[in-house]
Amino acid sequence: MKKTGIFNSEISRVIAKLGHKDKIAIVDLGFPIPSHVERIDIVLDFGRPTFEEVLKVILKELEVEQVILAHESSKKFEQIIKENIPRVEFLKISHEELKKLTNDVVAVIRTGDVVPYSNAILVSGVIF
C-alpha cells in the first residue's frame, strides 16, 4: 500500500505522466469540462472538497511554474493560490478563454467547490 503523497490513483497517475509545460485544471462544481479531456471527478458533496483542499494535496507531488486563472476570480481565490504557491507566475485571462484553454489540458479535476470562478489551470514546471 502507498504510504505518502496522493492516494487518488487517477490524480497520482496523471501527475506522474506530466512533463514540463503540460497542464492540468482544477475546477469548481459547475465548470463545463470538454468531453474529450480526461475528467477526474472527486466531488463528495456540495462544496466538498474545496479548490484549496485539492490544490494542497496536488502540490505534494506537482511542481507548478504558472497558474492561469480568470480575471473574474476573486482576490481571495488569488490569495489562496499565492499562499500555497508563493513564487508562482500568474496569467489572468477571461473566464471564456479559460474554458477554451481546458481543451488543451491533460486532465480536469472537478472539485465540489461552489465559489464562483474557483478554477485554475496549473502549468507543470521542472524541479531542477
From Swiss-Prot:
Role description: Catalyzes the interconversion of beta-pyran and beta-furan forms of D-ribose.
Lineage, opening ranks: Bacteria, Thermotogati, Thermotogota, Thermotogae, Thermotogales
Catalytic activity: beta-D-ribopyranose = beta-D-ribofuranose
UniProt-annotated catalytic positions: 20 (proton donor)
Entry's localization field: Cytoplasm
GO MF assignments: D-ribose pyranase activity; intramolecular lyase activity; monosaccharide binding
The protein's name in its UniProt record: D-ribose pyranase
Pathway info: Carbohydrate metabolism; D-ribose degradation; D-ribose 5-phosphate from beta-D-ribopyranose: step 1/2
Keyword field: Carbohydrate metabolism, Cytoplasm, Isomerase
Known partners and oligomeric status: Homodecamer.
